[in-house]
């Protein structure tokens, strides 16, 4: 895993410290163990998790400056991308939001095992925005949750004025972007 991560991070221009790489390895091991009984992710195996989860999520760090930002990951699932961002850039203040309590329990356990600070795991539906979280974040991220128009409606209310929303989408998203333009302008 270290070689895959090392090569991948170098290609992205990211230089995580040894502690971050160690935490990603521990994350992988615990994810694989718990995935056997919880169905956290369809992607498994060292190489696939390293490339398709860890490096894919870490690539967000090349999009904008996350340092010392307050970030929410809406529909985090097994912690993608939010937990990976937190591990690679620990100074992020992150909230992991998911509607399934079993995932939030897993993320709480994982955060504790990795001794992560400034991380909050919240069990809630994205559309049920608690008042204290409305307009409270600098950055909202989401990966593999819903179509872009729906994501705009779910994620944008969490952002402060001037905040950034980053939706991780596949290469064939042009139709989704065109479809979501109205929602983006209205919100």
Where are these regions (language model features)?
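Conserved SAM-binding loop of SAM-dependent methyltransferases across substrates and taxa
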Residues: 78-91
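Class I SAM-dependent transferase core
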Residues: 1-68, 72, 102-119
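Conserved glycine-centered beta->alpha loop in an early N-terminal alpha/beta scaffold
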Residues: 75
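Residue-level signal for inorganic ion chemistry
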Residues: 31, 85, 169
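S-adenosylmethionine
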Residues: 91-95, 99-187
């Amino acid at each position: 895993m270290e070689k895959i991560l090392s090569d991948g991070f170098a290609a992205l221009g990211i230089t995580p410290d040894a502690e971050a790489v160690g935490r990603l390895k521990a994350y992988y091991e615990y994810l694989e163990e718990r995935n056997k009984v919880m169905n956290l992710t369809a992607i498994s195996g060292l190489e696939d998790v390293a490339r398709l989860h860890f490096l894919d999520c870490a690539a967000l760090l090349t999009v904008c400056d996350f340092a010392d930002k307050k970030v929410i990951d809406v529909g985090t699932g097994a912690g993608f991308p939010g937990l990976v961002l937190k591990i690679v850039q620990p100074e992020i203040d992150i909230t992991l939001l998911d509607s399934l309590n079993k995932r939030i329990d897993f993320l709480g356990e994982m955060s504790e095992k990795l001794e992560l600070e400034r991380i909050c795991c919240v069990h809630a539906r994205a559309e049920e925005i608690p008042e204290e979280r409305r307009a409270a974040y600098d950055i909202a991220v989401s990966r593999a949750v819903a179509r872009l128009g729906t994501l705009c409606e779910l994620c944008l209310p969490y952002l402060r004025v001037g905040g950034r929303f980053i939706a991780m989408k596949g290469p064939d998203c042009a139709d989704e972007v065109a479809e979501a333009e109205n929602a983006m302008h209205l919100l």
